[in-house]
Swiss-Prot record:
GO molecular function annotation: enzyme binding; protein domain specific binding
GO cellular component: cytosol; endosome; recycling endosome; trans-Golgi network transport vesicle membrane
Recorded coiled-coil stretches: 195-291
Location in or out of the cell: Endosome
Lineage of the species this protein comes from: Eukaryota, Metazoa, Chordata, Craniata, Vertebrata
Domain Ras-associating: 25-119
Keywords, in A-Z order: Coiled coil, Endosome
The name this protein goes by in its record: Ras association domain-containing protein 9
Subunit architecture: Interacts with PAM.
Source species of the chain: Rattus norvegicus (Rat)
Length: 435
């Protein structure tokens, strides 16, 4: 951006003095002049494009003097409006500040450029109808929107500009009305929600009052029927019954432990376990019936609230009894399983001992039979020896033994001594068994 004096450009309008301060309504715009940005300050709502051109030319002449290259009058130049590839020459009387504000959010994409009229268009746009127009040989539908706008007459271009301003104003109005409608909808929604919340709070207060009345009525009825201390009695009775049940359970546990220590109460434990199981089933069925009855009675009047409280206390006591009986049953079941394991172990030991006893009995019987056979054979051999000695003959058995003995003594291997030892041990065992 080339340096130049802002104060100089601020005072280049026709109806303003150089020493007058800038009003708070004054604005500024950027105009491209010879590929440089020039800031034009002091714009008002009455400033036109020809005023901006005059200020730019005066500033250029004051800056460069005789070396200036923007020659000619202000009417020989025009300001071109460029936006996203399209461009349009502004008429001299265009309110430049109004046009700049109308672009709104598209201001960063829009530029003002100072060009010479003859270089931009063959014929200026603001001349009268007496000026001879050059015919364009190109077809209108083959031209770009910017070039097509250049071919239009000035009055039609003015109408298009006015129409564009009206459309922009309408768009702004529509957006503002849409925002207002959204805000109104939100306000109505908040008000309706606040109203519903107040109604719900009021209804809750009414229900609380009705509940308090019903409770007071039930309290008076209970005082008339059961006395003034019915609450203490209702809470003290279950405690005494619970203590008695605890004592009963402790005595039953001690008894079951004694029975287990004796080892003779397995059948009794099974019976007790069956009894507790039946009791558990019975209590569970009663609890289910009570729960169903409580569910059906929930839709009745508030007069049965006291009965429901008693039933709830009974249900709680029954649940406590059920839990205690379940614990006792689990203890008994654990003791019973331990006893069964011990019985199985003792049975296995007895079976092993019985098998050992049978094996020992078989061995003993076999040894006894062999000892009897040995004794009988010995007696028979004695009788035969006596008979042979009386006849003077040597029995063949002794002869064989003698021969084997002589043969063994002649051997050098030493096996005879081993055979003799084995024979002696076997004979000694036989004699011992015989005795």
């Amino acid at each position: 951006m080339a340096p130049f004096g802002r104060n100089l450009l601020k005072t280049r309008h026709k109806n303003r003095s150089p020493t007058k301060d800038m009003d708070p309504e004054e604005k500024e715009i950027v105009v491209w002049v010879c590929q440089e940005e020039k800031i034009v300050c002091g714009l008002t709502k009455r400033t036109t494009s020809i005023d901006v051109i005059q200020a730019l030319l005066e500033e250029h002449e004051a800056t460069f003097g005789e070396k200036r290259f923007l020659l000619g009058k202000a009417s020989d130049y025009c300001i071109v409006e460029k936006w996203r590839g399209s461009e349009r020459a502004l008429p001299p009387l265009t309110r430049i500040l109004k046009l700049w504000k109308a672009w709104g959010d598209e201001q960063p994409n829009m530029q003002f450029v100072l060009v010479k009229t003859d270089a931009f268009l063959p014929v200026p746009l603001w001349r009268t109808a007496e000026t001879k127009l050059v015919q364009n040989n190109e077809k209108p539908w083959e031209l770009s929107p910017a070039n097509y706008m250049k071919t239009l007459p000035p009055d039609k271009q003015k109408r298009i500009v006015r129409k564009t301003f009206r459309k922009l104003a309408k768009i702004r109005q529509d957006t503002g009305s849409h925002d207002r409608d959204n805000m109104e909808c939100l306000v109505h929604l908040i008000i309706s929600q606040d109203h519903t919340i107040h109604q719900q709070v009021q209804r809750m207060k009414e229900l609380d009052m009705e509940i308090e009345k019903c409770e007071a009525k039930i309290h008076l009825d209970r005082i008339g029927n059961d006395g003034a201390d019915y609450v203490q009695e209702a809470y003290l009775m279950p405690r005494s019954s619970e203590e008695e049940q605890k004592l009963d359970f402790q005595s039953e546990d001690n008894q079951t432990l004694e029975d287990l220590n004796d080892g003779e109460g397995v059948s009794q434990l099974e019976e007790q376990l069956q009894y507790y199981r039946a009791l558990i089933d019975k209590l569970s069925a009663e609890i289910e019936r009570e729960v169903k009855g409580a569910g059906t009675d929930g839709s009745e009047d508030m007069e049965g609230a006291a009965a429901c409280e008693l039933e709830n206390s009974d249900l709680e006591s029954v649940k406590c009894d059920l839990e205690k009986s379940m614990k006792a049953g689990l203890k008994i079941h654990s003791h019973l399983s331990g006893i069964q394991r011990e019985i199985k172990y003792s049975d296995s030991l007895l079976q092993m001992k019985a098998r050992e006893y049978e094996l020992l009995a078989k061995e003993f019987s076999s040894l006894h039979i062999s000892s009897k056979d040995g004794c009988q054979g010995k007696e028979n051999r004695g009788k035969e020896a006596e008979a042979s000695s009386s006849n003077g003959e040597i029995p063949p058995l002794t002869q064989r033994v003698f021969n084997t003995y002589t043969n063994d003594t002649d051997s050098d291997t030493g096996i005879s001594s081993n055979h003799s030892q084995d024979s002696e041990t076997t004979l000694g065992d036989v004699l011992l068994l015989a005795t």
